[in-house]
Amino acid sequence: MSAVLDLTCELIARPSVTPDDAGCQALLAARLKQAGFQCDHLRLGDVDNLWATHGLGAPVLVLLGHTDVVPTGPRESWTSDPFTPHIRDGVLYGRGAADMKGSVAAFVVAAEQFVADHPDHPGTLAVLLTSDEEGDAIDGVRHVARLFAARGQRIDWCITGEPSSTATLGDLLRVGRRGSLSAKLRVQGVQGHVAYPEKARNPIHQAAPALAELCARRWDDGYESFPPTSLQISNIHAGTGANNVIPGELDVDFNIRYNPHWDAPKLEAEITALLERHGLQYTLKWHRSGEPFYTPEGTLRAIARAVLAEHIGRAPEESTGGGTSDARFIAPLGAQCIEVGPVNASIHQVDENVRVDDLEALPGLYQRLVERLLV
């Protein structure tokens, strides 16, 4: 097997369901140390974080990834055991194959080869890994970014190995991400018998106009490469299960994916004003997952576009779509951030997989990116 395939299989065999690293970072740190990297373990609580650096000074290029994976779901639904890597018809199967143990393995193989070829390279090459990307994302890169901000750690460029490709490796370059804001809304009513509505207050009826306005609102028309801001209701519940009882309260969960027209405080104020205008008796709890970030045209984008175009024979699509990633914690440090990784068709699914040809091409892509940025 190739170096990257062998290492990916070793990582898949470690059942690192978030936030358990299951020994992945110890394995990777040993390899990076052997290649000459300085490794610092920044563990917090149950979360493992690894910061490995080679070289000194600016510019600083970070390869950002995570060693944790999502749960497998019913293991009997998998064609083969999710933590026993299997290759069938040129495809590697296993939890984390695409998201993102393949990218992490490719980072390490590319870093090893780069420092072997350029032992005295300018600037600093760093690898940052966490076991808290798929979970709460509090004690992982968010924590490390706070440490970096406190000590003035500079980061110029960040390449995240999230599975960004859609049909073929390198067909999409992620140049930003939307912000994410979640809310839990509870509308208070008065429970009663459906035959005596005058003695009750139905929170469903009261909240319906406000929810309709929230869902119908056009928040903006997009922002540069970003789509329009979107609010989606994800859960709604009221009632006792009986059809003769007016419920006493209504619970609604919703999420907003927003572009740089907005920030979390502005959205919170806007929605609070709407609820107040409808005269609801309510409580509202917010959870801020991260603000949007965007990498404008510049050195990193231009080099990444050129490297991917060489691989696929055409310019990649450049997008800010998809969910959140840990790059949202690195961007506020002043870094230009992009995401380049495998095809994402099977991520978080039963029989997650990556094409072996794509996996074996990935270290070369990453190494070319590093060389053009640092050499």
Curated annotation (Swiss-Prot):
Catalytic activity: N-succinyl-(2S,6S)-2,6-diaminopimelate + H2O = (2S,6S)-2,6-diaminopimelate + succinate
Co-factor binding comment: Binds 2 Zn(2+) or Co(2+) ions per subunit.
Active site per the UniProt annotation: D68, E133
PROSITE patterns the record matches: ARGE_DAPE_CPG2_2
InterPro entries referenced in this protein's UniProt entry, alphabetically: ArgE/DapE_CS, Bact_exopeptidase_dim_dom, DapE_proteobac, Peptidase_M20, Peptidase_M20_dimer, Peptidase_M20A
Keyword terms, alphabetized: Amino-acid biosynthesis, Cobalt, Diaminopimelate biosynthesis, Hydrolase, Lysine biosynthesis, Metal-binding, Zinc
Name of the gene: dapE
Swiss-Prot/TrEMBL cofactor(s): Zn(2+); Co(2+)
Protein name in UniProt: Succinyl-diaminopimelate desuccinylase
Family listed: Belongs to the peptidase M20A family. DapE subfamily.
Binding residues for Zn(2+) 2: D99, E134, H348
GO molecular function, one term: succinyl-diaminopimelate desuccinylase activity
Physiological role: Catalyzes the hydrolysis of N-succinyl-L,L-diaminopimelic acid (SDAP), forming succinate and LL-2,6-diaminopimelate (DAP), an intermediate involved in the bacterial biosynthesis of lysine and meso-diaminopimelic acid, an essential component of bacterial cell walls.
